[in-house]
Amino acid sequence: MATKLKSAKSIVPLLDRILVQRIKADTKTASGIFLPEKSVEKLSEGRVISVGKGGYNKEGKLAQPSVAVGDRVLLPAYGGSNIKVGEEEYSLYRDHELLAIIKE
């Protein structure tokens, strides 16, 4: 039996896992033409929704995550565990899988 989640706030990542919502590409051109879903490229950029407490390093000490809630991050093309909450899609990544923080 599948559990139906009401909100992404109910997902609390464990250890070094990071919950990310992928930023959607524009479906409309600057001139106002709507693009079909198949022609819209999937962006490799996301926003951090929640962060686990961190993983343990080789010395057994807790290593803090390298990102914070609200950060824009560059995502790998593959990987992560996909989660659907209502119509929204989220992904869980390990801290070391995220490629970069986007500062703009």
Curated annotation (Swiss-Prot):
Cellular component per GO, a single term: mitochondrial matrix
UniProt-annotated location(s): Mitochondrion matrix
Gene3D superfamilies in the record: GroES chaperonin (2.30.33.40)
MF (Gene Ontology): ATP binding; metal ion binding; protein folding chaperone; protein-folding chaperone binding; unfolded protein binding
Cross-referenced SUPFAM superfamilies: GroES-like
Coiled-coil portions: none
Keyword Phosphoprotein: yes
Keywords from the UniProt entry: Chaperone, Mitochondrion, Phosphoprotein
GO biological processes: chaperone cofactor-dependent protein refolding; protein folding; protein import into mitochondrial matrix
Phosphoserine: residues bearing it: 81
Subunit structure: Homohexamer.
Similarity annotation: Belongs to the GroES chaperonin family.
Protein's job: Eukaryotic CPN10 homolog which is essential for mitochondrial protein biogenesis, together with CPN60. Binds to CPN60 in the presence of Mg-ATP and suppresses the ATPase activity of the latter.
The protein, known as: 10 kDa heat shock protein, mitochondrial
Organism: Schizosaccharomyces pombe (strain 972 / ATCC 24843)
